[in-house]
Structures are given as C-alpha cells and as structure tokens.
C-alpha cells in the first residue's frame, strides 16, 4: 500500500488491527458529532496565500516550556498504546525523540514509566488523571519525577467516562466482549503475532507497578470506571501543583473562563481539547473553541491544542487560530499500528513537509509569524468563530 498521508495510515490500521482496537481509537462519544466536527471545522479554516515573499530561510523550530522543539508538535498521551504495536509506547517515544519533539506517556499505558524513559534522550512528558485513589496519583507522580519526566499533562475532562457506543459493537465492551476480542485477534494474524504474542506483557504498566500484580483489559475498564472522580475541583489540584516542580499543563479546556481559571491557578499551559470527541458529544470542536480562548489568555499562559489534526496544514491552522503548539493523537497511533516506530517517523516527516508547504505559501518564515493574518478573514469558518466570540462576550 502506498502511504502518502495520515489517511492512508488509518486505512492500513483498519486492516491490521482487530476491530475492538481500531474502533476504540477511531470512535467517539454518543453519535460522534463532535468527533466529525473536529476534523471538518479545522479543514474549513481557509489559509491566506501570499506570493513572492523570499521563503528560502524558513524554520519550524520553536521553544516550549524551555525545551527546543524541531517543530511545534508533541505526541499526545494515548491509553493502551502498547496494544497497537509491540511495546508501542517505546516505539512511539523513540520516533518522537529522533524527530526532536516530546512524547507524552499516558497514565494507562501498557509500558510503564520505567520502561520508556531510559530509551530516549529527551525527557518525556507524563499525563495524569484526577482519580479517587490519591495514593496511586502520588505514586505515579513520584515515579515520573524519578524518571526525569519534564512536564506534567493533567487531564481534567474525564470526571466520568464518556459513553462510546461504538465500543459495545466492536467488542471492547458489551455482551461476550472477551470472546469476541479473542476471535478478532486470531483472525488478524499480523497483529496477533506482533502484539498478541510478542508484545507481552499486556499489563497496564503504571497501574500494575502500583498494585503489585498483573492487570489486563478488564482491569483497565473496571479500575478506571471505579476511580474517575466527579467531585474534582480546582482545589483538588493544589497539592499536585505544590508537589510537581516542573511545567504543569491542564488538558481539556474548551471555555475562555476555564482558561482564565487555569491562569489564576498557576498552570504553565493548557490544552484546548474535547478529548478527541470521546467525552461529551455536542461540545465545540477545538478549532471553534480556540480563537476565543486565545483572545482571553494568549500571553498569560502557553496554549496547546488537539483534536482533529490530521496533517501539517492542520497544525498551521491551529497555530494561526491561537495555539503555540499542538498535540498529535489518532494520527500517530494509526501510523504506529501500521509500521511501528518507522510509521510514526514517516508520519512526522510528512507533517513537517506539509507544514513547510503551508508556511511557504502563506508567507510565514517562522512559527511566530503564523497568526490570524495567515487566514482568510472573511471565510465562512472565521465568520462562525467571530459569531461565537460575540456570543461568549454577551
């Protein structure tokens, strides 16, 4: 199969992966309206073409939390990454490290902190949820600090799991789920050999290390369902801010007032995100939410964005709408499932090339030069953004 875009990796991953795994990353909450709008709204943002600008010395380099990045991207935290390729977190982290961008390890990774961190030169980032088991949270933070993790990404948009109807149909959950997953595994031999047999153990590495016993997929579903904490408030984050002496990023911001609260709290960054459309269906896409948030807090806090980014043009669009950098999630997981570390490396190279084309043809020589001026101001999508900003201000 010829791979020329992230969409090609998605098609390849669908053939390789058992359906319960493919649809787990590909699907969203409820009827998946927000999942679709994430991609559609971002692709509707019209770039402003400029010509004859002497773009010979173009640079994608940027600085984020005092780290030099080869381009304004990082790999997002993705749960169960090690189920998509053999020791998937290690492979993805290696590709990010080689490219000169950060890798973020999920709380619910297959490979534990201690397995991934020693394999890369750049300090990785670590993602954590607010959970009922505060002992686990403290244990995870201590281990992340000991492993040299530089930045804490704190996910706050999961006080309760989203309803993902597709999971019940795919075998991730629902009737006879374990039997259905077994049958899917044996009928997908490439995955069964590479990951099913040779990618063991299939533990939730960070949780197993804390509990002192092996964990599996059923434990993942049950443990998280019992540990998400709907009583979470800003006060619950204070001890974490005191404990963690590195950059702290709040992930899951969609409203300007919440962004202002993050500034008042003392966070170093926010991620404008709807969890990839996997939590509350019907909320704004990240692309629609971002401009008003940027207007509210740009310059007071570092702004990252995710959800819907599928290529380098989307990265440029998000930065033009107000982000300082972006997180890549689904796109890199499709590539990882297809060709492992090399797939992720190739995807990052594709995104880099696409960014260079977009920047060359919009007249932005550096990341700092990408702004609202890089967009067509009277495009339909931007008119919608302006209307939303006016409604938020009213």
From Swiss-Prot:
Gene Ontology molecular-function annotations: FMN binding; L-lactate dehydrogenase activity
EC number: 1.1.-.-
GO terms, biological process: aerobic respiration; lactate metabolic process
Keyword Ribonucleoprotein: no
Amino acids binding substrate: 24, 129, 164, 278
Keywords: Cell inner membrane, Cell membrane, Flavoprotein, FMN, Membrane, Oxidoreductase
Pfam (any one): FMN_dh
Active site (UniProt): 275
Enzyme class: oxidoreductase
Cofactors demanded by this protein: FMN
Residues annotated as domain FMN hydroxy acid dehydrogenase: 1-380
GO terms under cellular component: plasma membrane
InterPro entries from the UniProt entry: Aldolase_TIM, Alpha-hydoxy_acid_DH_FMN, FMN-dep_DH, FMN_HAD, FMN_hydac_DH_AS, LldD
Main localization category: membrane
Location(s) in or outside the cell: Cell inner membrane
Recorded superkingdom: Bacteria
Role according to the record: Catalyzes the conversion of L-lactate to pyruvate. Is coupled to the respiratory chain.
Family assignment from sequence similarity: Belongs to the FMN-dependent alpha-hydroxy acid dehydrogenase family.
Protein's name in the database: L-lactate dehydrogenase
Organism from which the protein derives: Klebsiella pneumoniae (strain 342)
